[in-house]
Amino acid sequence: MSQIVTIFQNIRETETPFHRSVKCVLDRIKSGSSKELVQRIRKETDKANRNELKKELPAVCFSGQFNKRNDSAIIEHSGFICLDFDGYATKKEMKAERDRLTKDRYVYAVFTSPSGNGLKALVRVPEEPDNHTNYFNALEKHFNSENFDKTCKNISRVCYESYDPLIFINESSELWTSVVERDYVEVEVKRDAPTIPITDDNKVVEILVKWWTKKYGMVEGERNA
């Protein structure tokens, strides 16, 4: 297990990666390498301003080593998947979720998000880029939380560096190996029958007469008028 992840200076930077151990990144979160900025974010009451401030934080791709910040630029999977839990109505609910996550045998780490209103959880998975999304789908079912963010499944998903001196780490966490592949519903496309050109003049007239009669009716003697 490589346990090497990728850090970009911020979310705007996509092509200058730094590769560090996951331990290094979690140590930064615990010690507060971005403490001052995170505290500003948590004090900011305007959501738009918070989002702008977050763009200045280091951006971490926990799931591997990347040349650039996109899925196709992966060099090697780290053996980690980062999950988001957010949208809690109260701090009490968030604390209850955190307690539940720290007791889960598959959870490697849990820490508070930069906003202070959500949680990030790291889970160890096999180093299989092609199965990354399937592990994500299985973990969604496993945690069965209404606060689970379903949009964070792509392998190069960014996690902003946070600050949490009480970060939970369990280096003996178990490896998650179950996968769930989403069912694809085959949609039957009804196609019109191919049109066969009619070249016989009499046949054309016959078809037109039938159509006219059905639509408008015909008085005796009109056909040859």
Predicted regions and their residues:
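Short, glycine/charge-rich beta-strand/loop segments that flank catalytic centers
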Residues: 63-65, 114-116, 155
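Catalytic "initiation/cleavage/transfer" segments centered on a nucleophilic residue
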Residues: 2-13, 17-20, 28-33, 143-193
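Modules that initiate DNA replication and primer synthesis
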Residues: 5, 31-39, 43, 72-103, ...
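DNA replication initiation on ssDNA origins
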Residues: 1-79
